[in-house]
Design a protein with these regions (language model features):
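Pyridoxal 5′-phosphate
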Residues: 1-432
């Protein structure tokens, strides 16, 4: 059994927000790259924390013990999701951006003027601006690897040209939140390590779409955000144990953890654990087979279940994306940015960046929103890429993001609406 329409219908029943009506129709959430909806179990865990366990950590009483236990158990769940060696390599924070500013400061304290940091022109600013800030403070040099504009992939020749013996850290994304390009993560890590550099991978956009194994890709750091994979607003940092141990930490003196500042978001962390268990349950219910036997059932190891679940999600989502891409290709005046060759769809996520002739992305998103279809428009903090594509003055792109709770009928509904907008935009452009 794989994830298909009937299974998705069952899963959709676990998401209260997916039952919301707009104009007599359910709201179609095609805004996943900006944040996902959450299943009931996540809501219940957040609520239950306030109802029965609301206390700070470290106390000698039951509710404080419960808060401590929530964090310990959630670290283990995240370690399973990311493939970490130990839960101690998992750190929680307000969001990926805050965690990256924190870690960038710690790493920069070990560097000297003239040392170099490599970033990319495909990335979200949260994995660019922190490195620019510490470079300014410390007299470091930041080099930017450019994208190939024909397919919005990373220019690997430029990567090699800018990687040098002076490079101390390479920061890049697993996948582009703007156009969906998947980078060759393990290969980039290998090249960076051969040059003697640390690696810092932004997996925020990738996390809801496929497997993560920090040991397999061999990265030193990886960050993601639970609200992108059906959880609350919690930032997550993986750091290789031996690297974390040698970094200076910026913290209050009595704090026992070196990279978690202040009181943690216990309710959000409880919800994050629930979101990971939800993904593991997808693996148990709809996961792939191993050899001749199905790896399925209540007793499946969580790490194995997560791999099976993310594999099932990836296969289902990309089936929907093919349907969407084929439909967009037939629209008059429409342009899909990024990898468009169906034979290369394995190199992308199910996120479409679109422009329509004669209509701004904001106008298109507004029109879709009025008929109950949620999308995003703009640059999504991937300013460098949108500028290089020459789309900033036009308002960026219209972004359509598929996740596993979306359906074929929602894709068809979206395509019908886009066709109306495209034909109207072409007519306006011709008249103008």
């Amino acid at each position: 059994m794989t994830l298909a329409a009937d299974g998705v219908a069952q899963l959709r029943g676990e998401f209260p927000a997916l039952q919301r009506l707009e104009g007599g129709r359910t709201l179609a959430f095609l805004d996943g790259p900006g944040g996902t909806q959450v299943p009931r179990r996540v809501i219940d865990e957040v609520s239950d924390y306030y109802l029965s366990s609301n206390a700070n950590s470290g106390g000698a009483f039951a509710t404080s013990d419960a808060s401590d236990r929530i964090v310990v158990e959630a670290r283990a769940a995240v370690a399973d999701l990311l493939g970490a060696d130990t839960p101690d390599e998992v750190k929680f924070g307000a969001n990926m951006t805050s965690l990256t500013f924190h870690v960038s400061r710690s790493i920069a304290a070990t560097l000297r003027p003239g040392d170099e940091i490599l970033v990319t022109g495909l990335d979200h600013e949260a994995n660019v601006s922190p490195w620019l800030a510490v470079a300014k403070d410390r007299g470091l040099t930041v080099r930017t690897v450019g994208p190939r504009l024909d397919d919005c992939t990373l220019d690997l020749d430029d990567f090699d040209a800018k990687l040098s013996p002076r490079t101390r850290l390479v920061a890049f994304g697993w996948a582009s939140n703007a156009v969906g390009t998947i980078n060759p993560v393990a290969e980039l890590v290998r090249r960076a390590h051969e040059a003697g550099a640390l690696t810092y991978v932004d997996a925020v956009h990738w996390a809801p779409h496929g497997q993560i194994d920090v040991r397999q890709i061999d990265t030193d750091f990886l960050v993601c955000s639970a609200y992108k994979f059906f959880g609350p607003h919690v930032g997550i940092l993986y750091g290789r144990a031996e690297v974390l141990e040698r970094l200076p930490a910026y913290k209050v003196r009595p704090a026992h953890d070196r990279f978690e500042t202040g009181t943690l978001n216990f309710e959000g962390i409880a919800g994050t654990h629930a979101a990971i268990d939800y993904l593991a349950d997808i693996g148990r219910r709809f996961g792939a087979t191993q050899g001749s036997k199905r790896v399925q059932g209540a007793f499946m190891d969580r790490r194995l279940a997560l791999r099976a679940g993310m594999t099932a999600i990836r296969e289902y989502e990309m089936g929907l994306y093919r349907r969407l891409a084929e439909g967009i290709a037939a629209l008059p005046g429409a342009r899909l940015w990024g990898i468009n060759d169906p034979d290369r769809f394995s190199e992308r996520t199910p996120t479409a960046a679109l422009t329509l002739a004669g209509m701004s992305p904001r106008a298109a998103a507004t029109a879709l929103g009025r008929i109950g279809i949620a999308t995003w428009d703009g640059d999504f903090y991937a300013q460098g890429l949108i500028e290089r594509l020459g789309l900033s003055e036009e308002g960026g792109v219209l972004r359509l993001g598929i996740v596993h709770y979306n359906t074929e009928s929602e894709i068809d509904r979206l395509l019908a609406a886009l066709e109306d907008l495209a034909r109207g935009g072409v007519a306006r452009a011709a008249a103008g």
